[in-house]
Amino acid sequence: MMPIKTFVSERRAANLLAQIRWRNGVYCPSCRAESVIRYGSYRVFQRYLCKDCDRTFNDQTGTVFEHSAVALRKWFLAVYTYIRLNTSIRQLDAEIDVSYKTVYRRVQRFLRALDAPRPHLEGPVEIDEFYVKAGLKGRERDQPSRSRGLSTRGRGTYAEDKLPVFVLADRGTGERHVIPAKAATESRIRLLLADRQQESLTVYTDGFRAYDPLDEDDAFTREYVVHGDGEYVNGDVHVNTCESHASLARRWLSPHRGVSKDRLTPYLRAFQLRREVFRKPGKEALKTILETAL
């Protein structure tokens, strides 16, 4: 159930922000000192004074919600529906009655605050890649129009506006990671698999040639299926989990038409967060979403 009371009361929204922001204790955002005292209020937010640097701040200072004339409850509704319901920014513009540019800037600021995925692999691990068409949307037209003829053969790259996105499915922990790259190369694959708990990590892949060097590396035990030969499952060897997760990622990107390749990473981090809160009740999901960005 959606946490409706938080979305209609500015006081409740402010209290929730303070609860999450200072969950490890109040400190000064400027000098990080903990010697602070209450110092009046600013609108519905508690104000503080730092005894070390003599600066004042409030519950919003230093967060993605600071310096905004829009009510905090509206921003809570925006980030909640954006993550939980995959609502487009154009639709949020209508729902919270705030201009498109204002919503876009604030949502982008929220997305940039999300942590990058750091896979710590236990294994066995499935790894696969899919490709996302992402161009130069949002940039000034400083170059001639590109040809719209038939695409060239081969795998996509950042330069060709078709970015590879790797999906890692750790069967040991059940975690899924979606990580974009500029190219699907051996070096990038090794970097993704570098943080592992075992000396020899079991890796399941398809027949893509970039994975072939793993066969000669003692740090990996690679097993694979060749889709081109009609082979998709061979006992425990398959990448079906990755392909299923990739289809969910494509569906996530669908309402956000024409994502720029320079901004694809934050959108995929939002997708990762959505998978974390998917089964949580409304209030708990909102807390998790805010904790991730604060």
Curated annotation (Swiss-Prot):
InterPro entries linked to this entry: Tnp_ISXO2-like, Transposase_27_IS1, Transposase_Zn_ribbon
Q: Does the keyword Isomerase apply?
A: no
Q: Which GO terms describe its biological process?
A: DNA transposition
Q: Which UniProt keywords apply?
A: Plasmid, Transposable element
Secreted keyword on record: no
Superkingdom of the source species: Archaea
**Name recorded for this polypeptide:** Uncharacterized protein in transposable element ISH50
Which organism is this entry from? Halobacterium salinarum (strain ATCC 700922 / JCM 11081 / NRC-1) (Halobacterium halobium)
